[in-house]
């Protein structure tokens, strides 16, 4: 009788532990964004843009006239391709293909430009090359020529602003993976290291705060109004995206993989305590008084980087998932409007005060890159499980 009683009690304890475990697991995942709803938000925002720009090759007319393969549009297509990979609609593919063909698969301002902003379009060319089974070498001909010329020059100081990391690093690593030639990985690190350790005197990375100054003009003694260092949200978002993409394509055996991983994880960790209550991050990460408020682009890039890390098992899901959910919920409810217009987007610039003040109905100088950031975020949030 004693043995039966003991066995029964033990079974109840085990059942209770199992139940708690299941409940805990369900609690962790209970608030995951609904996949259909994530796609609906992304599709709504994207359709608004495609309706407004039916001709992907059309020049962009603002204060100046820009060819449509400039960096802002390139970032949009990075997001569109990411969306296509989780929701392969032919219209997305055709839109990206038409854009690439109209620019002859070449860089903005010529094949041998050294400016990462002009080269960013190459990321989509490389993606389309792979999507079609590597059957069209003309799609990567000029990208490869451009990167090869960078390598041949021996120079490594071109990425003097941190936005350039997102525009340029993924091209080197994608080429490295596609061709199997380690020279692209080597050059990528050489240029990254110059930005991190040398630009501005001692580099643009603050190892103490685990955040990045946008360029040398923001390295101390420059301060924000509250006396803190100036860490621009979108600028640090570009670094997050650059590192996520670099980790995706760089072999783990690469001698610099662990450094990329550490920098990526440290940056994400630095973002945790400064997320706003409403889910967004301020444009000035360490000075909420300097145009603090909702801002979509930096927040979307942080969501992209964090969700990517969760999906790849690079960061702790329990720690980061609530942060991602809170931020994505803010984007879905506050940023993407019922008609697809994207609100709270800081215009182009280099610091918190640019493009201010923001508003729910304010149209930024370019409407494309903000959408690209949101589509990148949506593509990784969709994969969460």
Predicted regions and their residues:
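Extended ligand-binding clefts on enzyme/binding-domain cores
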Residues: 162-163, 173-285, 292-303, 315-349, ...
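Helix-capping and short linker residues that terminate individual alpha-solenoid repeat units
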Residues: 50, 54, 88, 104-109, ...
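CBM-like carbohydrate-recognition segments
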Residues: 27-74, 86-102, 106, 110-122, ...
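Bacterial lipoprotein signal-peptidase II cleavage site
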Residues: 21-27
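C-terminal motif of bacterial Sec signal peptides marking the signal peptidase cleavage site
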Residues: 17-19
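Bacterial N-terminal signal peptides that target proteins for export
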Residues: 1-9
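Asp-box/WD-like beta-propeller blade repeats and closely related beta-sheet repeat scaffolds
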Residues: 136-172
């Amino acid at each position: 009788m004693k043995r039966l009683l003991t066995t029964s009690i033990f079974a109840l304890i085990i059942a209770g532990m199992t139940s708690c475990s299941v409940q805990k697991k369900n609690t962790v995942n209970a608030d995951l964004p609904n996949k259909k709803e994530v796609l609906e938000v992304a599709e709504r925002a994207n359709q608004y843009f495609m309706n407004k720009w039916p001709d992907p090759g059309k020049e962009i007319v603002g204060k100046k006239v820009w060819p449509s393969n400039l960096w802002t549009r390139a970032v949009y297509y990075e997001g569109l391709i990411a969306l296509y990979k989780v929701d392969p609609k032919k219209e997305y593919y055709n839109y990206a293909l038409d854009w690439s063909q109209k620019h002859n698969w070449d860089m903005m301002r010529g094949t041998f430009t050294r400016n990462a902003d002009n080269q960013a379009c190459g990321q989509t060319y490389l993606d389309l090359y792979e999507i079609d089974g590597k059957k069209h070498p003309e799609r990567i001909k000029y990208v490869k020529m451009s990167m090869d010329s960078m390598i041949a020059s021996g120079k490594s100081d071109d990425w003097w602003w941190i936005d350039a990391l997102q525009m340029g690093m993924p091209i080197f690593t994608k080429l490295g993976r596609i061709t199997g030639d380690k020279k692209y990985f080597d050059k990528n690190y050489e240029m990254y290291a110059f930005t991190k350790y040398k630009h501005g005197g001692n580099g643009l990375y603050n190892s103490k705060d685990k955040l990045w100054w946008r360029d040398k003009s923001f390295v101390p003694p420059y301060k924000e109004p509250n006396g803190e260092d100036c860490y621009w949200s979108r600028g640090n978002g570009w670094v997050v995206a650059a590192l996520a993409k670099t980790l995706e394509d760089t072999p783990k055996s690469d001698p610099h993989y662990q450094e990329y991983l550490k920098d990526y994880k440290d940056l994400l960790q630095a973002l945790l305590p400064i997320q706003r209550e409403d889910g967004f991050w301020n444009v000035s990460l360490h000075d909420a008084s300097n145009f603090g408020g909702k801002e979509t682009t930096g927040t979307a890039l942080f969501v992209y980087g964090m969700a990517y890390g969760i999906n790849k098992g690079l960061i702790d899901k329990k720690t980061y998932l609530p942060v991602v959910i809170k931020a994505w919920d803010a984007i879905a409810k506050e940023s993407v409007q019922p008609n697809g217009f994207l609100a709270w987007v800081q215009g182009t610039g280099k610091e918190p005060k640019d493009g201010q003040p923001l508003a729910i109905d304010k149209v930024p100088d370019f409407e494309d890159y903000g959408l690209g950031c949101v589509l990148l975020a949506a593509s990784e949030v969709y994969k969460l499980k």
